[in-house]
Amino acid sequence: MFRVFGSFGSKGNQSSGEEQSTKTKQVLKQANDFEIALKAMDFVLDDRTDEGLNLLKKAEMETGSDQTILTLARGVIEFLQATLSFETEEMKRAAITLGKAEQMSWKSKQNAEKTNFRSSSIYPPGTVYAVTYTESCLLHALLMLFSESMMEAAKALLKLRRAYTMLQDIMVTVKKAERSKNSSSPSPSEKSQESCGSFVSAETTFISVDIPYKLSSEDKSNPLLLEFAEKIYTMRMGRLSGAHIGNTPSFHRLRDDLGLQTTPSQASDRHSVSDDFDLEQATIDEFIHSGANLCYGILQVVLSLLPPAIGAVLSIVGFKGSREEGLRLVWKATKERNVHGCIGLLGLMFYYDGPFQFTDADFDIPPNDNGSRALNKSRTNDSSLLPGYMDSATLLHPGKILEDALLKARALFPNSALWLLNEAKMLAGKGRLRDSLALMDSIDVNSIRMRQVKSLMVFERAILLVNLHEYNRAADDLISLLDISDWSHALYTYFAGCCYLENWRMTQLGLLNDGKEQFYKERARELIFDAPSLLGKKTFKSKNLPLDRFMLRKVQQFNNMQKKLNLQEPLDSIATSPVHELAYFYNGYNRMTENDLILTKKMLTEYHNPAIDSEDPDQELIRNLLLSLTLRRLGDAERGLALLDDIVLPKIFYIQNGKVKYFKKTEDPWAYPAALYERALFCWKLGGMESLNECREWLLRAQNYAADYELSTRIGMKIKAALDRVENALA
């Protein structure tokens, strides 16, 4: 069995002075191993996974190394790989490692408490392992939830419950420490002299914040201890500046603005590490509060987004979340220059600009900050007065704050395509599609070492190209994913076929004249109708993905229409082009420029074939729903609303005796709640604050449409996020 604190041999026959010296070595060894773990994870965030794993392997072989944090670091690396790709073997490998880290953390926590091992001047013995335990639990539980097994999901909820309970206790201590730090207590330097280890030699006096007590007279002059303490300080300073993994200090690359053509900030020449970070913060203390803020924050946000039925059950046992509190904690974690800050930033990027549209840019309802702040004050003893507090308006639209955080990550990790990709996505979210594409094209995807990031880059670029109606390149990217990613070959193939279908239609309308009409036709037919044969091959789940089920249903619809109309050409059985549906799922209508929207409108209204001319009610519903959104984005909200009210919604529900009754429809399950959601958005756009009660009614209708349906997670979370925002504004 490994010895967490046996770094420097047994205490068997030691004198009190020797015991004190051994204890100090153990404290420093722990801080050293945590710095090694943080460095290894930073290598991964800079697209240098092999270097990070090799560093961990070397550290694991050292006698007396802290195997707990090293195992967790390996688990975090594998978790990042798994959640970027969702591939079977990587999910399994990460789950096994995190399970080990979970067990080791619990044993280390108990050992530290039993031996009263103090490695922090702020937190009780064992706290840092309580954090590694909750982090392991949280990440492990998320992987179990992704498995879509009922048994694994039940186990995951138990893990989350344990993590939640422990994090609540940790957060009490963290908040107490924060209040103490911001009170009229002694300055950090004075406090350091009172509670930290001070070394004195002929040449220097050095205070180590990593030693949470005064040193004995012998240890104060111990050159080996001094050398070890200075080494840890140097490691930490290198990490804070971004120079620890072989890059030059990050502030030399820091920019003020997004985009390929921007240059480093003029202020970067005058920048120093002390401008951003507390240099007198111990490594263990930093890990504790950044890890606690991140994990508890993520838990709060995830719980707040759960469907009402599940949320109600969990709240009965005290398992509930506050989105605002959770977001504030995640934002607080991003202020730290370690892996917790980076994971927090990735989470925020997904929240603000991901496919689930938790913060739909069109639903820009100003928050009722007074109510939420009053509630928060009552919970946190006036935490709104603490430095860095973010009010509700800032949490809803962080704007430049999120942009600056991303630019710092880009400067810290210049070799990583992951952060470049997030910058490109942010540009696209701002409507700067061409700038986004230029940034993506600035890197050779074959130079990306991390295969999972490479596949993400190619897929996101394909989505962007679809929004720009550049379907040739989009199809090429999607087909190339068959050799890169094992996620869903069926969806990649179908999506590429839809791109070729749209190109074929554009040639028929005279909008594209490249002499490849027959090629587009043949490729569209081949890829769309062959895609179902790839289902079940190279997917990470035992069940088909939601978008796989969407694809399978659509192809079956096309086949049924072909038989119904007795058509020779399969492509003539496709009414509304499915590429427009896929664009909706990936927030395309909010990102398209005016010219792109005009072309979308033209393709939805001017193209004709036998399936379209048959005016099938279900296909007309899809076409008119997407057309109404296009009109709204083009500034013609009144016309879009009329289309929705007169043609789309009467096919979805009716009012009987004052109660909403839904038509039982299964042809396109995602579209019906989505139409009700979009009706609420129309209400907001045309009525403003005076229409909030009506908005709420439409969102409740959307939420109550069905308990489960195709793409219910994607659509349902968007609905719940909007409903929470409306109810907050009405409070």
Swiss-Prot record:
Which top-level group of life is the source organism from? Answer: Eukaryota
Classification via Pfam families: Iml2-TPR_39
Phosphothreonine (modified residue): where? Answer: 380
Where found?
Cytoplasm; Nucleus
GO terms under biological process: cellular response to misfolded protein
Give the record's keywords alphabetically: Cytoplasm, Nucleus, Phosphoprotein
Q: Which GO terms describe its cellular component?
A: cytoplasm; mitochondrial outer membrane; mitochondrion; nucleus
Q: Where is this region: Disordered?
A: 1-26
Q: Where is the composition biased (Polar residues)?
A: 10-26
Q: Which residues carry this modification: Phosphoserine?
A: 265, 268, 378, 383, 392
Instruction: Tell me more from the record.
Output: Present with 4980 molecules/cell in log phase SD medium.
Q: Which family does the entry's similarity section mention?
A: Belongs to the IML2 family.
State the oligomer form and interacting partners: Interacts with lipid droplet proteins PET10 and PDR16.
* Functional note: Inclusion body (IB) resident protein that interacts strongly with lipid droplet (LD) proteins. Involved in LD-mediated IB clearing after protein folding stress, probably by enabling access to the IBs of an LD-stored soluble sterol derivative that acts as a chaperone in inclusion clearing.
Protein name as it appears in the record: Inclusion body clearance protein IML2
- Biological source species: Saccharomyces cerevisiae (strain ATCC 204508 / S288c) (Baker's yeast)
The beginning of the lineage is: Eukaryota, Fungi, Dikarya, Ascomycota, Saccharomycotina
